[in-house]
Amino acid sequence: MKIVFSRKGFDTSAGGGPSPIVAGRPVSLPIPAARNAAGAASVTTYGDLGLGEHAARASRGRLGAGDACHHDPMFTREGECLFGQCGAAQTHLERQGVGAGDVFLFFGLFREESGGEPHHRIFGYLRVAELIPLSAGAPAELVERGHPHALAMHARNDCIWRGEGRLAARASEALRLTVPGARPSLLRRPDWLRRGGLSYHDRADRWLRGGKLRAVSRGQEFVADIGSRREAPRAWLESVIAEIRASG
């Protein structure tokens, strides 16, 4: 079994700043949409999602209600998550053997309501049920939903991961990754996660004493292979999912 720590949403390079926490709720802002050779890759604006003011504030006025956003991952009212991936990031997931039954934990950069401290936190999950390749065309249902990866191909290996998923409705301490008072990239890691157990994090100087991990500054998908019998990581994962679901 694999746990994928999947970095998503606004940050200082994509969007311009951290996503907000509003009345105790983490609100992950989708990154701005791009156009590709196939045409418009989004039919959704920040205003459509009720995020116009938040996008304007986080981007310092560079974005607003009328700007198109890359609405992905997409969480549905039916309790599903639709997550598109492609290019090198998708190739990495395939090489790591990610598939049905594995879990994505989406995390991003947020700003504390009080004090404004930027930090990383988990804001949602996807338990994979199926992987939908898009090279032969997107299912009509996904096009109708306006999923950006269904509207236009982003790369030759474009696909959508689909399964049960939820967003967290409260910014609880249990979902915070950044060490309190530290730079956003210094993360608290669970006891079961050790050096060699997370893709793109092989360097010894990233694994610090006291259960800390200095995360890489770039990249989207970081995979932890927890095997089929290890109990500690499974218990940790289920506690995270339970916290997300309880807050919803």
Predicted regions and their residues:
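Contiguous surface segments at macromolecular interaction interfaces
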Residues: 1-50, 131-248
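Short N-terminal edge-element motif at the start of the domain
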Residues: 51-119
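Short beta-strand-centered aromatic/proline hotspots
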Residues: 115-132
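Conserved hydrophobic/aromatic beta-strand scaffold that supports enzyme active sites
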Residues: 5, 103, 123-125
